Amino acid sequence: MNNSQKSKIIIKILNKTYPKVPIPLNYKNTFTLLVSVLLSAQCTDVNVNNVTKKIYPKYNKPEHFVRLGRKKIESLIRKIGIFRIKAKSIFYLSKTLIEKHNGKVPNTYEDLEKLPGVGHKTASVVMSQGFGYPAFPVD
């Protein structure tokens, strides 16, 4: 058995032992995934899902949140901890995505971590769940 065959067997065993676990947050696209992960800081996923289920059917793109403005975002996420700080991050994150990334969520750690409110853990979750890159998000 050559190294390539051994590698395939090892990968098969690892994939079976450590399957991809879906994130418990509900989202519609990579942008709403990013927002949900940002909202989940110091908050339960259940609470985030309860709040976002009323938001995402209508507001699910960066331009939607820029049009809403910070105060309206605050009122929509009021039930989530530190909502004023998170609303500010979501507003400026959305604005930055439009101005620097054509409204798209970037798919590199470097670009994600430059976005307002996005740290390495948030970037890791988005890279893994949103783009399928191997990542190990750590809180």
Language-model-detected regions and their locations in the chain:
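Catalytic cores of DNA base-excision repair glycosylases
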Residues: 2-139
